[in-house]
């Protein structure tokens, strides 16, 4: 088990590498805990860093629990402002819920000054989410220049289902990163996720590598 307060750190050139390292890390170092939605193995603190080498870095692993249709549907939802029958979606929270399109504002901010540290979007609404059951896992994201023409994306999760969601999440975040980079005249580079609680549900363990 990791030391108290010490995060698990994984890095790779592909989402598959990051996913396998994160799952293995949680299996080895995770603690068994009973949570609201069932027993999990978890680490409290995960940093997952991806340095993609090309489009193939985002190929879906053959043994990933979700099929390609599910991954692409999630990817589309991240930029779609419509709720489409859900209690919340990330696209709605990012682009409509707070009365403004945060993605467009980020593009504008980076276009005005690509060295800004204020290109931040949030999904968490404390007025609602502290009392609800269905709440965002992704709570905030920040896009920032790498000091040149590259654009990094940093995402913050309160809770992250590494077993089933990591690959789909990172693919969708990359699409958002590309969307912003293209409109701001930058090139998407690295993608880093910080999760306060990263876990695998015990019922999913037999189906994971």
UniProtKB/Swiss-Prot annotation:
GO molecular function (one): thymidylate synthase activity
Pathway assignment: Pyrimidine metabolism; dTTP biosynthesis
Enzyme class name: transferase
GO CC entries: cytosol
Top-level taxonomic group: Archaea
Keywords annotated in UniProt: Cytoplasm, Methyltransferase, Nucleotide biosynthesis, Transferase
The keyword Manganese is assigned to this record: no
EC number(s) reported in the record: 2.1.1.-
Subcellular locations according to the entry: Cytoplasm
Subunit relationships: Monomer.
Assigned protein family: Belongs to the thymidylate synthase family. Archaeal-type ThyA subfamily.
UniProt name for this protein: Putative thymidylate synthase
Organism listed in the record: Methanopyrus kandleri (strain AV19 / DSM 6324 / JCM 9639 / NBRC 100938)
């Amino acid at each position: 088990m990791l030391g108290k307060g010490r995060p698990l750190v994984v890095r790779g050139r592909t989402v598959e590498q990051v996913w396998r390292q994160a799952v293995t890390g949680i299996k080895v170092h995770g603690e068994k805990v009973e949570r609201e939605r069932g027993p999990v193995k978890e680490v409290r603190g995960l940093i997952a860093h991806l340095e993609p080498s090309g489009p193939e870095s985002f190929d879906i692993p053959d043994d990933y629990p979700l099929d390609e249709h599910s991954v692409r549907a999630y990817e589309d939802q991240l930029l779609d402002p419509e709720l489409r029958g859900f209690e919340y979606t990330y696209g709605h929270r990012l682009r409509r819920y707070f009365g403004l399109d945060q993605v467009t504002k980020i593009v504008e901010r980076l276009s005005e000054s690509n060295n800004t540290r204020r290109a931040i979007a949030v999904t968490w609404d404390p007025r609602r989410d502290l009392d609800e059951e269905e709440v965002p896992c992704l709570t905030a994201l920040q896009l920032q220049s790498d000091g040149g023409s590259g654009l990094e994306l940093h995402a913050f999760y309160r809770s992250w289902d590494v077993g089933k969601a990591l690959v789909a999440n990172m693919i969708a975040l990359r699409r958002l990163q590309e969307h912003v980079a293209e409109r701001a005249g930058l090139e998407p580079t690295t993608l880093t996720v910080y999760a306060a609680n990263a876990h695998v549900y015990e019922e999913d363990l037999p189906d994971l590598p």
